[in-house]
Structures are given as C-alpha cells and as structure tokens.
C-alpha cells in the first residue's frame, strides 16, 4: 500500500518537474521509474525516494538552452561518477558543516526560480523566449489564454485548501491532474497539453556511449559539478531530516553511492538527474 501511495504522489511530481526543467514530461516520468528501480536498490535508508526534483529543475532550465538535451545527458552521467566517488571516499559526512541559513536561502531561491519559470505556462502564453522580467513588462500586451489561467488557478487553490487528512489517502496533486484532464476533455478546451508519453522505457532521445567525448566532458565539467553538489546537498539533507523523524539514521556515504549509480545509468534511458526527496 505504501508503494501505491508513493507512486500516486510521485507521478504528478515527475511530470511537473520534467516540464518545469525545460525538458519534457516524459523525461521526468522515465527518471522517476529508473531512479525508483536503481537508486532504491542501493539506498542508504528505506525511506529515501529518488526522482526529478524542483531543485534540479531550477538548474536544468538554465542549462537546457545552452547545452541541449545531449549536454544534459552527459552532465548527468559525469555527475553520477562524481557522486559515486564522493560516496566511496566518504564525503557524505561533510553535509553537517553546511550552515542552516544557507539551506534556507537555497530552498527559497529554488521556489522563486521555479515559480517565475512557469508564469508563461500559467497564462498559456506560447512562443515567448524573453526573461521573466521581460514577460512581466509586456504581459499586458500579450495574448493570455484564459482557460489555461483558470485551470492553473483552480489547481493552485485545490493544492492549498485540500484537507491534509485526505491527502494521506489520495494526493491533491493527483486529484488536480485527474479533474483538470476531465474538464479539458469534457469541455473540449483548446489548451496546451503535456503531449505524447513514450510507450517504451528508452525513447529516441537518450545518451549513447559513442556520444561521450573528452571535449564535451571538459565543456560540461562545471554543470556536472553543479549537479553533483546539488545532488549531495539535497539528498543528504532530506535523508537527515527523515532520519530524525523515523529514528533511523541514514548511511550518508551509501546514499551517495546509490545516487551515483542511478545517475550514471539514467541518461541512457533518456532521463534527467535524479535526487532524493521526502514524500509526506
């Protein structure tokens, strides 16, 4: 039953983080599946759940335009190697040295980046490539798709006011997806949709060994390090928090090994970087 509950929560999150990262909903879904199978098998704690996250989406959205999907795949592969080495050399214990205000500012910044990046989707504005500030400056003169905005607003309200006691049995995010999908179909609303989800676990867009070369690895070193640092930070902080709540401390270094193995393989399935997160 716990597995079904987690899957119900993870499905809408995987789709949402796939889109908000600048990739596709399919990439988010594939990441959740592969990460769930591989990372959980080697994890340092039974309560850790891995998949695409909001924090990683905030980084990827700035990388996808510059390096493309293949660049993301290679950076993820490199980050997986770095995470694996970090676990082997027992660097997981360094997480306790990070100041609390740094983490607070980090998570707040992620929330702002994700929210600002989804403004144009919220208003149903297509083909706008400017920055968030450009969008806010000219939004009055842009064509706003009101059905998209209304659906987005109702979804937010449902997520805010949905009773927490109900959420343990049926997640608000999953209910929002079901209701909005039914509304679009029943009313025949012309709004942008996620699109076709591949029926195969390995889509056409995925990393191939022949595409990995030294020059690309040099170019993508900094993005790979960024993914690695974020992977270490979020995964171990989530594990520390859940460990205190369950009185079962996590093996930090084993968790890094698991994250490393998972992110080495995920790009070959067409997925994006996976981290650990807490589902409550």
Language-model regions: role of each:
Residues 1-278:
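Transmembrane helical cores of multi-pass ion-transport proteins
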């Amino acid at each position: 039953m716990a597995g079904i509950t987690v899957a119900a929560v993870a499905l809408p999150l995987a789709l949402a983080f796939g889109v908000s990262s600048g990739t596709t909903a399919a990439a988010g879904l594939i990441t959740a599946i592969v990460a769930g199978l591989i990372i959980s098998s080697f994890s340092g704690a039974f309560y850790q759940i891995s998949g695409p996250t909001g924090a990683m989406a905030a980084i990827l959205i700035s990388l996808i335009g510059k390096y493309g999907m293949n660049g993301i795949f290679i950076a993820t592969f490199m980050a997986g190697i770095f995470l694996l080495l970090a676990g082997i050399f027992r660097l997981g214990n360094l997480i306790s040295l990070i100041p609390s205000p740094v983490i607070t500012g980090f998570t707040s910044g992620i929330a702002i980046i994700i929210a600002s990046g989804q403004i144009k989707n919220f208003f149903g504005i297509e083909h706008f490539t400017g920055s968030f500030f450009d969008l806010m400056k000219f939004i009055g003169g842009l064509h706003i798709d009101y059905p998209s905005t209304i659906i987005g607003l109702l979804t937010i309200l449902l997520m805010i006011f949905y009773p927490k006691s109900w959420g343990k049995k049926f997640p608000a995010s999953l209910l929002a997806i079901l209701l909005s999908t039914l509304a679009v179909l029943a009313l025949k609303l012309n709004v942008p949709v996620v699109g076709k989800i591949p029926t195969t676990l390995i889509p056409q867009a995925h990393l191939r060994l022949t595409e990995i070369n030294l020059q690309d690895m040099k170019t993508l070193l900094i993005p790979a390090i960024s993914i690695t640092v974020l992977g270490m930070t979020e995964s171990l902080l989530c594990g520390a928090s859940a460990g205190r709540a369950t009185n079962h401390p996590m093996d930090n270094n084993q968790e890094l090994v698991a994250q490393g193995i998972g992110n080495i393989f995920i790009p070959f399935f067409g997925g994006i970087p996976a981290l650990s997160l807490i589902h409550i």
